[in-house]
Amino acid sequence: MKLKKINENLQQALIENGLTEANEMQQETFSTLKSGADCIIIAPNGSGKSTIIVLNVIQQLKGEGEESPRALIIVEDKAKVLEMEEIFEKLGKYTDLRVYGVHDKGDMEYDKNYISTGIDVLIGTPFKLSEMFTTAGYNVNRLKMFILDDADPILKLRHETRIMRISNSINKTQRIIFSEQLTERIEILADKMLLEPFVFDFDEEEEEGFDEEESEAEKDFEEDEEGLEEE
């Protein structure tokens, strides 16, 4: 795959997995993502968003670090956790990155103990990650990348406040949102979480505009925040 200044070990793994040519989305986003800027990337299902996530994490982290995670990836469900782990296994073949996934059906104590031994990339579902970050107090000072994949279905399940709770515990890091559509909920979350993001829209369908008045999505967000504060 021909991308500017791509890691040689990553390049080799991409070629071995048949990824010899970068598609439009990979070409147009690679340099911006590599720069560390916040981004919103909109693209349809099957366009290679998961591959972009993995190759950019590998590109930035390069190899094994210290004990604390340096990339945090939020995905929709257990199936997505396993899928992302599999892509890391393939494309990270020539790196020593330590990747670990958590989901709602996993054992909390086992997950906490495993993470405490040292990992580089943590993948998980919103509920599980929120619960873990609330109770375990992980060191997030070395976190370089905070990535939200599957943003549209995740926000439809009203996980905004859990995501913000995790994001607010992190000081300076690159924040990236991936989704199939740029919905109102995503725009509201991005306004709260991202700093002057670059927006890449590869969705063929044109998005409708949003009203300036407070929307139903905003009201839902505020209600969710109030509910979680009472927990």
Indicate where each model-derived feature is located:
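The conserved Walker
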Residues: 43-47
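Conserved pre-motif I regulatory segment
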Residues: 1-42
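Helical mechanochemical/support elements of P-loop NTPase systems and associated helical scaffolds
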Residues: 2, 6, 10, 21, ...
